[in-house]
Amino acid sequence: MKENKPVDPYAKYNEQSNIIAKIIFASRWLQVPIYLGLIVTLAIYSYKFIKGLWALVINVNDMDSNTIMLGVLNLIDVVMIANLLVMVTIGGYEIFVSKLRTRNHPDQPEWMSHVNATVLKVKLSMSIIGISSIHMLQTFVNASNMPEKTMMWQLLLHLGFLVSAIALAYTDKILYSTSHKTH
């Protein structure tokens, strides 16, 4: 005697839904060219750093201390932006595309062992504040050549970054404490 299996009325829907889910999941790979573009941008910043360092070295005898300080601050700014690019590239790829699988690599940065969206947001906001701080320092070292209105807007923008970072940290603290409460 042949057993009649019940017909699943949702079988076709489930199959289509599964195909859509696979397409959506695979779409994360569309970000790869973006991360590769960030690596190209990092190469551009490396070139800019070397060019700025070379200009500082060959012109050091013709520079006063303020000009040297501005040159050094510019180099620090380039380094901080490069660090930001590395964090976004590695962190974004790890979080949104695929694992890098570098767990046993001796040069793996410490922060990569616990990278997640929250850690990345905090690191990014701290980097942006650091970059903004360097720009503020450059502005105040060169204050005699800067319009007052430009300095005011830079200060307000920097304060906006600070307030945003504090709000982000506070929000993450609330979310973390709420999600980890024991009942």
UniProtKB/Swiss-Prot annotation:
It comes from the Bacteria. The keyword Membrane applies. Pfam families: UPF0114 (PF03350). Keywords: Cell membrane, Membrane, Transmembrane, Transmembrane helix. The keyword Transmembrane helix applies. The chain crosses the membrane at residues 38-58, 68-88, 124-144, 150-170. GO terms for cellular component: plasma membrane. It is a multi-pass membrane protein. It is found in: Cell membrane. NCBIfam families: HI0507. Belongs to the UPF0114 family. This is UPF0114 protein CGSHiGG_05795. It comes from Haemophilus influenzae (strain PittGG).
